[in-house]
């Protein structure tokens, strides 16, 4: 931070309050590089009460436990079970690894919250933000790759299955694509990683009022949010359109044959593929929007809008949303995979999982049933 920044922090507007000990401000007690790393915006706010830090720490402990256990089981089962090592499931495995990384950095946040501030310093901040960049951007692009895989498999059932080599190239592409956006701020070539909110978490700088910062925010928003979101919407819209058209053709043919349905397994206990795929597509889009839209909007407001809207408490909400989705994903999707549940049932009978052998689900796992787990495991 330059001299102007330090003068701002120690300015007359806070000196009376600080000398009287009336209000503890964010950043109090920090010096040198740690103080210089904090955007001026946060230094104008009072420190949050200890109860806020405690509540967030407890919430993150719960998220961390659920995410590490859930994603850890997905990684273990999918990587050690031969029948689950299909090309499509490599993408599910990569997504679980990224979600695991997302929450593996949570102890830094929990420690900062326990110490009520920027306790880990700049080094811990850089590690936290680097892991967040790789896991966040990588998860978005992996979701886009999964959407492409599902679209290819469902719309071209005869020749749409992706080869193992192609999927591995897609996984490599995800990590290569994420690397510049993760390393450029770390090396301070373009952008930088800074504390945010209660100074217990770190992200890329979206508050410094410079052209370089604004350009970086615009580019990373486009490449890490708009691009994968557009792909996800395009591919899942294509899936829904294809399935609805197929269902309409079946109904028309059944009408011509004067039968109620051409489906052999029609019954109240079995949802049609139309409904299953529509639900999967809607849920995938919703989770991606719910997890990253708040953060994207916050970054845009910080760079181009009214920064006064971004109070420390408000900016903690997007961070919680991202962690919640990393926690929920394995439980909502991969654990619904019939073959995955059967493997859990075999290895961990004490979980009391009741998953009967379902030959229909197994046989159709390449077309409809695999869509939900591959969406955002």
Swiss-Prot record:
Stretches of the chain found on the membrane's Cytoplasmic side: 79-89, 147-166, 236-283, 336-377
PANTHER family per the UniProt record, alphabetical: OPSIN
UniProt tissue specificity: In the retina, expression is essentially uniformly distributed, but a higher level is seen in the dorsal region of the retina and in the dorsal rim retinulae.
Species of provenance: Manduca sexta (Tobacco hawkmoth)
Positions in the Extracellular compartment: 1-57, 111-126, 188-214, 305-314
InterPro entries hit by this protein: GPCR_opsins, GPCR_Rhodpsn, GPCR_Rhodpsn_7TM, Opsin
Region of interest (Disordered), residue spans: 355-377
The protein's name in its UniProt record: Opsin-2
Function: Visual pigments are the light-absorbing molecules that mediate vision. They consist of an apoprotein, opsin, covalently linked to cis-retinal. May play a role in photoperiodic photoreception.
Bilayer-spanning residue ranges: 58-78, 90-110, 127-146, 167-187, 215-235, 284-304, 315-335
Glycosylation sites: 3
Protein location: Membrane
An example molecular function term from Gene Ontology annotations: G protein-coupled receptor activity
GO biological process: phototransduction; visual perception
GO cellular component: membrane
């Amino acid at each position: 931070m330059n001299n102007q920044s330090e003068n701002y922090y120690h300015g007359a507007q806070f000196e009376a309050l600080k000398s009287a000990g009336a209000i503890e401000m964010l950043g109090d007690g920090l010096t040198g590089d740690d103080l210089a790393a904090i955007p001026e915006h946060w230094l104008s706010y009072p420190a949050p009460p200890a109860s806020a830090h405690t509540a967030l720490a407890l919430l993150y402990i719960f998220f961390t436990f659920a995410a590490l256990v859930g994603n850890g089981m997905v990684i273990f089962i999918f990587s050690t079970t031969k029948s689950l090592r299909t090309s499509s499931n490599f993408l599910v495995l990569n997504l679980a690894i990224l979600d695991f990384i997302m929450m593996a950095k949570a102890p830094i946040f929990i420690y900062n919250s326990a110490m009520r501030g920027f306790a880990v310093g700049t080094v811990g901040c850089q590690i936290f933000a680097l892991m967040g960049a790789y896991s966040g951007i990588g998860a978005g692009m992996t979701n886009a790759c999964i959407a492409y895989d599902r679209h290819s498999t469902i719309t071209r059932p005869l020749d749409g299955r992706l080869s193992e080599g192609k999927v591995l190239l897609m996984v490599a592409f995800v990590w290569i694509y994420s690397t510049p956006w993760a390393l450029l701020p770390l090396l301070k070539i373009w952008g930088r990683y800074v504390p945010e909110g209660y100074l217990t978490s770190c992200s890329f700088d979206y508050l410094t009022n410079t052209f370089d910062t604004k350009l970086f925010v615009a580019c990373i928003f486009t490449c890490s949010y708009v691009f994968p979101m557009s792909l996800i919407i395009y591919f899942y819209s294509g899936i829904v359109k294809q399935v609805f058209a197929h269902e309409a053709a079946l109904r028309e043919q059944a009408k011509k044959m004067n039968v109620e349905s051409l489906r052999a397994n029609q019954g109240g206990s079995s949802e049609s593929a139309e409904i299953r795929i529509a639900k999967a597509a809607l849920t995938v889009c919703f989770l991606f929007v719910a997890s990253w839209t708040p953060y994207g909007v916050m970054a845009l407001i910080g760079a181009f809008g009214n920064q006064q809207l971004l109070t420390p408490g408000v900016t903690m909400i997007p961070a919680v949303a991202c962690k919640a989705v990393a926690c929920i994903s394995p439980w909502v999707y991969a654990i619904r995979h019939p073959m995955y549940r059967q493997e859990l049932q075999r290895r961990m009978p004490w979980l009391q999982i009741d998953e009967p052998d379902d030959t229909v689900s197994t046989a159709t796992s390449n077309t409809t049933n695999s869509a939900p787990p591959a969406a955002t495991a």
